[in-house]
Amino acid sequence: AGADTRSIKLGIDCHTMSVIGPPLAPDPGRKRPLICLSNGNGTCPEEWISSLASCLAIVFKEQVAINTPFRGGHITRSHGVEMPWVQIEISQTDAYSNAFKRNCMLDGLQRFCHTVF
């Protein structure tokens, strides 16, 4: 039997992304944002992804992109029918340490959960 998912509110698919779009990417040669959130155009409510973007922008002190350059990957598209999903892409930039990015991400996610749930 599968896991009981009734208490799970949102699935998160989190990755890092290159600072500059590689040749075969949707944005070849372009500088990417620090954070890109994707909902596959509907795998989570618009209010949620907007709220998450706002919470992350507060802690990172940078604008957060939504569905640019990514619109959601295989996991968000495949499982978005079962429950809400969001994809989070974090830049591999050296402008911020991994510890800073991790701490800000956790703070932003906590703010989001307190706001939405």
Which residues fall in each region the model found?
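His/Asp/Glu-rich mid-to-C-terminal helical/loop segments that flank catalytic regions of hydrolases
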Residues: 96-117
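Catalytic cores of processing enzymes, dominated by hydrolases/peptidases
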Residues: 1-97
